[in-house]
């Protein structure tokens, strides 16, 4: 630990996903034809009606501080949309807190619920920021390995094996980043029942809920009975479904007292989210004319998913991967080509960008350095070119490994 810094950031490390994008940008500035399939954001523009709402808010002078919990118009629009997505169940706008992105919503929840000498279970592989957020909250993240035979999801049995009296929280993410795995409603119900028995809070990150390749939206904790939601914080936002990553709008739905506490915490950190962005997000969640664009983007992601899965099965038949049922990532194993020169996925990705100018994210960012994440939030041309480069790299590394074995045998 650097003696200049406090214990609050002792275990903190920078985002590996952003580091990949930064390296890709550096190579582009040098004139290299880089294919970047590392980005975790939709490649589509923000819907026109949404962008225009942000402009109107600016022109109308809606540029002052917003309430810490968010403008009522956005909270009401989110409440209505969540209600519609979950079969019309009542959702109260007073239980919603708007933040500067879903990441801040997760952080607000963790800071309000967890602290020193307490543990938070995190199914792994997991989004790179979850354990970092828990560390900054001075709690201890405990990664629970997902089952490779079950799309790297975890069951109650795995959670139970890691539980002790110090476990106070569980962070869930479905559809998942980096795996694209989706928990069924029955699986969510079993986990919620387990958490209730154990007195464990669930922070459910459902930012990818609308990007689902099954029927309708992905199953949600919000689809469960009220008695299973008493210790659940549901996190969502505008970034993924509405292609609004740069607008920085996240939301949390929580029990009333916790929602008030999260808003109070935010009042002492960032204050309310960007006012103009909130008006744009109110249009996104509230205007029914915008929703077909979400469906169109999801349909495009589905076609890309199908293309990737088809090429992997045909051209990389020995490579294990999780078939994504949501989000826009393909997570695949690369340890078959590990050797002296490429001992892990981090080095695999370093070699990949050096040899083929293809940027992917190593699994170390998500807790398992045998895997790599490929984002198909990219153009069809970039995907075709990217897979071509990836296939060449697998062949190159397999040849290097075979040559090394021959030399060792000789």
Regions found by a protein language model. Give the residues of each.
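Generic short alpha-helical segment signal, independent of protein family or function
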Residues: 55-63, 83
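Substrate/cofactor-recognition hotspot
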Residues: 9
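PLP-dependent class I/II
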Residues: 2-5, 13-35, 41-57, 87-410
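Short gly/ser-rich anion-binding loops that grip negatively charged ligand groups
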Residues: 40, 61-68
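Conserved N-terminal alpha-helix of the aminotransferase class I/II PLP-enzyme fold
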Residues: 65-99
């Amino acid at each position: 630990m650097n003696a200049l810094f406090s214990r609050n950031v002792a275990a903190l490390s920078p985002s590996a996903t952003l580091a990949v994008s930064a390296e890709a940008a550096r190579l582009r500035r040098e004139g290299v034809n880089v294919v970047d399939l590392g980005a975790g954001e939709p490649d589509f523009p923000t819907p026109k009606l949404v962008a225009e709402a942000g402009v109107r808010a600016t022109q109308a002078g809606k540029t002052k501080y917003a309430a810490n919990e968010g403008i009522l118009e956005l909270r009401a629009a989110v409440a209505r949309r969540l209600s519609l997505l979950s079969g019309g169940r009542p959702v109260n706008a007073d239980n919603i807190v708007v933040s500067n992105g879903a990441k801040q919503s997760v952080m607000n929840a963790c800071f309000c619920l967890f602290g020193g000498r307490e543990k938070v279970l995190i199914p792994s592989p997991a989004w790179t920021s979850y354990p970092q957020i828990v560390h900054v909250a001075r709690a201890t993240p405990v990664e629970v390995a997902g089952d490779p035979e079950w799309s790297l999801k975890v069951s109650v049995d795995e959670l139970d094996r890691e539980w002790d009296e110090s476990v106070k929280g569980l962070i869930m993410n479905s559809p998942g980043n980096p795996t694209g795995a989706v928990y069924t409603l029955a699986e969510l119900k079993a986990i919620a029942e387990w958490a209730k028995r154990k007195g464990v809070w669930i922070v459910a990150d459902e930012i990818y809920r609308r990007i689902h390749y099954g029927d309708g939206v992905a199953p949600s904790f919000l689809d469960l009975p009220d008695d299973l939601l008493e210790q659940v914080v549901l996190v969502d936002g505008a970034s993924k479904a509405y292609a609004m990553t740069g607008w920085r709008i996240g939301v949390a739905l929580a029990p009333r007292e916790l929602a008030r506490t999260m808003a109070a915490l935010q009042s002492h950190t960032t204050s309310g989210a960007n006012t103009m962005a909130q008006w744009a997000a109110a249009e996104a969640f509230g205007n029914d004319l915008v929703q077909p664009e979400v469906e169109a983007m999801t349909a495009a992601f589905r076609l890309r998913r199908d293309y990737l899965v088809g090429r992997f099965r045909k051209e990389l038949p020995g490579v294990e991967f999780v078939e994504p049922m949501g989000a826009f990532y393909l997570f695949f194993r690369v340890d078959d080509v590990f050797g002296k020169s490429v001992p892990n996925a981090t080095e695999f990705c370093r070699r990949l960008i050096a040899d083929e100018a293809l940027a992917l994210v190593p699994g170390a960012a998500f807790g398992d350095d045998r895997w790599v994440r490929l984002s198909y939030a990219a153009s069809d041309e970039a995907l075709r070119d990217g897979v071509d480069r990836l296939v060449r790299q697998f062949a190159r590394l397999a040849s290097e490994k075979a040559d090394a074995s021959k030399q060792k045998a000789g």
